[in-house]
UniProtKB/Swiss-Prot annotation:
This is 3-deoxy-manno-octulosonate cytidylyltransferase. GO terms for biological process: CMP-keto-3-deoxy-D-manno-octulosonic acid biosynthetic process; lipopolysaccharide biosynthetic process. It comes from the Bacteria. NCBIfam families: kdsB, PRK05450.1-5, PRK13368.1. Belongs to the KdsB family. It catalyses: 3-deoxy-alpha-D-manno-oct-2-ulosonate + CTP = CMP-3-deoxy-beta-D-manno-octulosonate + diphosphate. Gene3D superfamilies: Spore Coat Polysaccharide Biosynthesis Protein SpsA, Chain A.
Length: 248
């Protein structure tokens, strides 16, 4: 099975302008993400899909493969589907460009079911969060998932799900980590669908799959992977790199 990691990247992000080129200890954020992606064992091919000549120029200087896409993509997976038209591959891993702390082993996790011979429509990652972590659970920037007994997603939301009734602290919540693996044909079908009602309401592209009858297998990880969406999160990541943790 030929696997390709594709990182969608745009310059005009909403909450943190030009974050892909933000400096993190001498390297742009997008380069830091690519460096960790290249350490994944499931593939040695990492491609960035972007509509920004500025991002493309930065990446080519450090020998990262780039596919230029149009400005019409409505989400990262649509951008990847466009890039996939010019790429060979059976499985495409959508890794967010704002994940400079991503553990390469977690990238391997989304590919693992396919490498075992399974054929889910799509896989993604979830991270368990104790019910006592109310600040995380209530944060609308943290996407939560509920999954069935077979490990497939029932729903994703920015709201706290399941609803907490009373003071029961035994419930485990799941934080969604936005890495996806798509079979080529599912990725193509996804891109051909119009954004769904719930997708637009929650601003979560994966709901387009669920609303159209696709199943998303959720793989649990014990390694969290905070993204960069705010100045505070950017400074947190910079501090981690300055401290030069062994995991990096």
């Amino acid at each position: 099975m030929e696997i390709v990691i594709v990182i969608p990247a745009r310059l005009d992000s909403t909450r943190l302008q030009r974050k892909m080129l933000a400096d993190i200890e001498g390297e742009p954020l997008i380069v830091r993400t690519c460096q960790n992606a290249m350490r994944a064992e499931c593939t040695d091919r990492v491609v960035v899909a972007t509509d920004s000549p500025e991002i493309a120029e930065v990446l080519r200087k450090v020998h990262v493969e780039v596919v230029m896409t149009s400005r019409h993509a409505r989400c990262g997976s649509e951008r990847i589907a466009e890039a996939a038209e010019s790429l060979e591959g059976d499985l495409f891993i959508n890794l967010q460009g704002d994940e400079p702390l991503i553990d390469p082993a977690t990238i391997d996790l989304v590919a693992a079911p396919y490498l075992r011979g399974e054929r889910p429509d799509c896989t993604t990652l979830v991270f368990p969060v104790p019910a006592a972590e109310t600040a995380l659970i209530d944060d609308p920037h943290i996407v939560k998932a509920v999954i069935d007994s077979n490990g497939y997603a029932l729903y994703f939301s920015r709201s706290p799900i399941p609803c907490r009734r009373g003071a029961n602290l035994s419930t485990t919540f799941y934080r969604h980590i936005g890495i996806y693996a798509f079979q080529r044909e599912v990725l193509q079908k996804f891109a051909g669908l119009e954004p769904s009602m719930l997708e637009k309401e929650e601003s979560l592209e994966q709901l387009r799959l669920l609303e159209n009858g696709f199943r998303i297998q959720c793989v649990e990880t014990t390694v969290d992977s905070p993204g960069v969406n705010t100045p505070e999160e950017l400074e947190f990541v910079r501090r981690i790199f300055r401290e030069d943790l062994p995991s990096l």
